[in-house]
Amino acid sequence: YNGETIQVALGKGDYVAGGAKGMPFLSFENLNKLRPMIAGEVWDDITDYPEIAKEMFSGRCDDPVEWATMWKELGADIICIRLMSIDPFKKNASADDAATLVQRIVDKTNLPVMVSGCGNVERDIEVLTVVCEKVKNTRLLINKVEEGEYKKLATAAMANNHVIIGFSNL
């Protein structure tokens, strides 16, 4: 294995991820001493969330900000907000509402935030671009950008000091 990941500062600069020069958890190959960040995943629309999993959160998953706060209390290093409500075939929530929610989570938890879309590539790019433009007091991790669709979103992310996760089917 001869690849490596770059180090990136997330949040307000006080969290650093990456920098590995070997496979995860192989300390004899990987001289990077940063431990992996543990993420707590939050959905903004739990309509399709598994019922059995909802039970674990004691009703706190009904409010995404409260759910993110719970993850912080449990020791999560980063919050991953999955914007399921923006799906055009379901709730079709606005990009502004999504950006407001991300900002509320950032403000309430003071943790780095990874933002994921609903899986509809066109809608994800539209909404995540607005999120990049409106959330400015932290460095977001935008998840994920596919090869043929990255230019607009990458431009918005870079212009606002956010980072993106590239995705490539092998």
Locate the predicted segments by residue.
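Catalytic beta/alpha-barrel core
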Residues: C80-R82, K91, P112-N120, N137-Y150, ...
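Active-site-adjacent beta->alpha loops and helix N-cap segments on the catalytic face
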Residues: P88-L101, N120-L128, V145-A157, L170
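Short, surface-exposed basic-aromatic patches at helix termini and helix-loop junctions that form
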Residues: C132-N137, T155-A159
